[in-house]
Amino acid sequence: MEYLKRLALLISVIILTIFIMGCDSQSDTAENPKEGSKEAQIKKSFSKTLDMYPIKNLEDFYGKEGYRDGEFKKDDKGTWLIRSEIVKQPKGKVMKTRGMQLYINRNTETAKGFFVLKEISENNNRVNKDKEEKYEVKMVGNKIIPTEQINDEKIKKEIENFKFFVQYGNFKNFEKYNNGEFSYNPEAPIYSAKYQLHNDDYNVRQLRKRYDISTKETPKLLLKGGGDLKNSSVGQNDIEFTFVERKGENIYFNDSVEFIPSK
């Protein structure tokens, strides 16, 4: 009888050990994608792209090469398109966006774009053209300035003080981001990664301060990339921080850096 008890105890210990080892293995796989796997390649590609953040002086883009596909002409140095936009919809109210896009032409070493304010209709999710405001801007000496007279001093000041996320965002701890959800489409090619962030994350704190985001909900980070995973050059990089996402209530921030053919 004593022998059977010892045997049963031994079997229980073995089963428990195997179970714990299995859990640890699954945890390691979720937190740290296996080296050489598609997930690891995606994270490595984003790591290379995000390593350029921040670029405080936008004029540095004039000397930065990007991923070139078949649409680029041989003599075209390409254009960087950078965008940053905050989207807010308080509960039960209209969705409003405000942001800027800038075309940085490497051929002419000039940069121009728009500062845009929009309202989004809840019925069809389209821009209400009657409520859209668009102001032309240009970059001179790493400063954004309006190209036309603006009577609204508040908007004028907002334009002149505007900073793109690429100028202050910092992903030095990206390698420590765990439990990512990955997807990959080799045909396009496009790929993505999603992470749950914490409120003490540097970028989260920056966005809360700059855009007066009062909610205490922890945001999700969605990264979307385009181009060859094995190529170190940037083709397209989209970043989205989602703070609130509910029917009739939304707060999220969009940022993108894209290398496109010059027009």
Curated annotation (Swiss-Prot):
Keyword annotations from UniProtKB, A to Z: Cell membrane, Lipoprotein, Membrane, Palmitate, Signal
Annotated compartments: Cell membrane
Record's bilayer topology term: Lipid-anchor
Alphabetized Pfam families for the sequence: DUF576 (PF04507)
N-palmitoyl cysteine lipid attachment residues: 23
Lipid anchor positions (S-diacylglycerol cysteine): 23
Origin: domain of life: Bacteria
Signal peptide: 1-22
Any one GO cellular component localisation term in the record: plasma membrane
Family listed: Belongs to the staphylococcal tandem lipoprotein family.
Protein name according to UniProt: Uncharacterized lipoprotein SAUSA300_0415
Organism from which the protein derives: Staphylococcus aureus (strain USA300)
Encoding gene per record: lpl3
